[in-house]
């Protein structure tokens, strides 16, 4: 249960194809550049150690550009396309309202429904947050999600294991994500954050 202004976070460690989680203590991060909802389509923060490949945190919260198989994979999401691409979602239930499950991503742009092969963008039919923005200060990036119809805001924080002067630790094959949820109302909420990620070993993104 979370109450007003309390935050819960999920730490997701992606290393060697594995996923683990633990509680994260929220803290303020530096911001050098802010991008609003209209300028997120090409925003992607590469997450991963030096020389280990990366997966990028997109400007609206999506996981994209999975380049961990030693080949370029821009736009690769581990699948051709569809609702089985990796994603995180949030479940919110108050004491007196119907529970809601929403994709932890901001809105799509209209042109993303116009693929040259006639197929839609990943998760095109999922409910999403209405508002999104991105704050960057490499190696840190933050996606800010909000919606007037939801009693929570979410901040997605991602960063690299970049330690200047320490090549070994900077080369760890790891990406770090934290999902911070804030209750914007006065009533307690039941909140869960969960993720779905298929095993895509054997695919490198070169023929997607």
Give short role names for the model-derived ranges.
Residues 2, 19, 57-59, 67-69, ...:
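Composition- and surface-driven signal marking solvent-exposed, interaction-prone regions
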Residues 40-42, 51-52, 63, 87, ...:
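Extracellular structured ligand-interaction cores
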């Amino acid at each position: 249960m979370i109450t007003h202004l309390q935050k819960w976070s999920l730490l997701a460690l992606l290393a060697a194809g594995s996923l683990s989680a633990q509680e994260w203590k929220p803290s303020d991060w530096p911001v050098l550049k802010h991008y609003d909802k209209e300028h997120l389509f090409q925003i992607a923060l590469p997450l991963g150690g030096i020389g280990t490949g990366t997966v990028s945190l997109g400007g609206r919260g999506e996981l994209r550009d999975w380049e961990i198989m030693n080949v370029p994979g821009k736009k690769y999401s581990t699948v051709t396309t569809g609702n089985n691409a990796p994603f995180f979602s949030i479940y919110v239930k108050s004491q007196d309202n119907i529970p809601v499950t929403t994709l932890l991503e901001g809105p799509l742009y209209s042109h993303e429904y116009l693929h040259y092969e006639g197929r839609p963008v990943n998760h095109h039919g999922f409910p999403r947050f209405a508002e999104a923005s991105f704050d960057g200060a490499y190696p840190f990036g933050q996606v800010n999600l909000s919606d007037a119809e939801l009693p929570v805001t979410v901040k997605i924080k991602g960063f690299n294991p970049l330690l200047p002067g320490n090549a070994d630790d900077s080369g760890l094959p790891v990406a770090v994500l934290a999902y911070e949820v804030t209750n914007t109302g006065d009533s307690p909420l039941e909140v869960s954050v969960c993720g779905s990620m298929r095993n895509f070993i054997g695919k490198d993104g070169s023929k997607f």
